[in-house]
Amino acid sequence: MTSEIPKPAKILGLLGLLPFLIALFSTINANLYFLLVSYFKININELQIIYSTIILCFMSGTYWGITSNAKNQDTLPYTLSILPTLYILGIHLYFDEYLLPLIGFGFILLIPIDIYFSKSKMAPKWWLLLRIPL
């Protein structure tokens, strides 16, 4: 297995940042904000919340796929794989008023899970090279 990030993973990973970047730049560029809100009817906070929720759940599915394909079929990898989904569900249910900062914290919490899957050799060798910058 190579340690070079496959081109499709790199390109699609970077494209996955677009909704985050659009939301970020719309907060510092009034014209972009006006275009998104008026023309496309996009609520920037909703864009961030919905897309971030999707990505955290996607990461759970990714971790589950890595785990189910590994030789190590212990409980810990499966438990770690569902944590992002349980986390996002919990903050949506109980901490709605702090949703955006807690979602941001959820992405930080992915880092130790990524490190675990990489160090345990369940994830591809290039995994952290892709995940940490994203």
Q: Positions of the model-derived regions?
A:
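Non-cytosolic membrane-interface motifs at loop->transmembrane helix junctions
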Residues: I42-N45, L76-P77, A123-L130
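Transmembrane helix-loop-helix
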Residues: H92-P112
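The first (N-terminal) embedded transmembrane alpha-helix
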Residues: P8-A30
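Core segments of alpha-helical transmembrane spans in multipass integral membrane proteins
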Residues: L17-L21, E46-L93
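Short, Lys/Arg-rich, polar N-terminal cytosolic tail immediately upstream
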Residues: M1-I5
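Helix-loop junctions at the membrane-solvent interface of multi-pass transporters
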Residues: S26-A30, I91-F95, S120
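Membrane-interface helix termini and inter-helical loops of multi-pass transporters
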Residues: N29-I42
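Interfacial loop-to-transmembrane junctions
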Residues: A9, Y116-L134
